[in-house]
């Protein structure tokens, strides 16, 4: 591969602004993402760290097409995907997935797990109807859950189990790139390590690329290839994990490391 094709995702001068009103006739915006440039290499775990309100989740949602960018360019596997989700080809949607922070709000409480996992398979025409149950069973086993979970509902499960289902749903389409938006922050400490270890095993087994969003710097020390720090909508520092923890240079990064 050339250096250009090594990058599975490239973000160039991305801006996502939200209009919040007018003051003296002038439009006022929240600059949630304000000129971010970032490249993620195939097969790596890129850590994106920042406090609440730094813009990291907005960046993720813009990359996924859930928010339209105000300005800038997003390229995935060499294809410009800056337009919103509705204008993206199905094969791009299939290849890019996201796991949200709160599985309780991201899973339909009125559906059982079989229905939840079948939906992406149906949307993308991945398997025939008669093979659906077998495929759902395989997906459940991928995240270390038995087929007995198939007819449970999200409300009957614990937070860790629900997040495993969220991960299973994201992996159902066999993506190459997954955004993990604080996937363990809403879980008990006892289950966090299990989820992280499972994600790393899946990443290695399936050669996945992760954009791992978190506020937990210590977690990134152990799992990330590189780390980027987001502050007030901008990336203020980015380096290899070793370099980042050994020789941080930005005052905000130093503050995070000392807190």
Set out the residue ranges of the language-model regions.
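Conserved ABC transporter NBD signature motif
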Residues: 72-80, 92
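P-loop NTP-binding/switch modules centered on Walker-like glycine-rich loops
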Residues: 187, 191-259
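Conserved ABC ATPase signature
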Residues: 153-157, 161
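Conserved ABC ATPase "signature" region
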Residues: 131-148, 201, 257
């Amino acid at each position: 591969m050339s250096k250009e094709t090594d990058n599975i995702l490239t973000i160039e001068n991305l801006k996502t602004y939200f209009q919040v009103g007018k003051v003296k006739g002038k439009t006022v915006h929240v600059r949630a993402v304000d000129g971010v440039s970032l490249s993620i290499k195939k097969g790596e775990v890129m850590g994106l760290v920042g406090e609440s309100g730094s813009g990291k989740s907005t960046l993720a949602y813009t990359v996924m097409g859930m928010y339209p960018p105000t300005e800038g360019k997003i390229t995935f596997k060499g294809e410009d995907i800056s337009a919103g989700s509705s204008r993206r080809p199905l094969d791009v949607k299939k290849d890019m997935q996201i796991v949200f922070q709160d599985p309780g709000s991201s899973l339909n409480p009125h559906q059982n797990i079989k229905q939840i996992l079948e939906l992406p398979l149906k949307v993308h025409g991945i398997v025939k109807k008669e093979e659906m149950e077998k495929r759902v069973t395989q997906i459940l086993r991928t995240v270390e859950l038995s087929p007995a979970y198939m007819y449970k509902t999200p409300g009957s499960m614990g937070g860790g189990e629900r997040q495993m289902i969220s991960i299973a749903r994201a992996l159902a389409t066999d993506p190459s790139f997954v955004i993990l938006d604080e996937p363990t922050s809403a879980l008990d400490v006892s289950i966090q390590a299990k989820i992280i270890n499972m994600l790393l095993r899946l990443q290695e087994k399936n050669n996945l690329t992760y954009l791992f969003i978190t506020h937990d710097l210590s977690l990134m020390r152990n799992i990330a290839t590189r780390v980027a720090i987001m502050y007030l909508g901008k990336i203020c520092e980015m380096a290899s994990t070793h370099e980042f923890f050994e020789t941080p240079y930005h005052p905000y990064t130093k503050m995070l490391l000392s807190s």
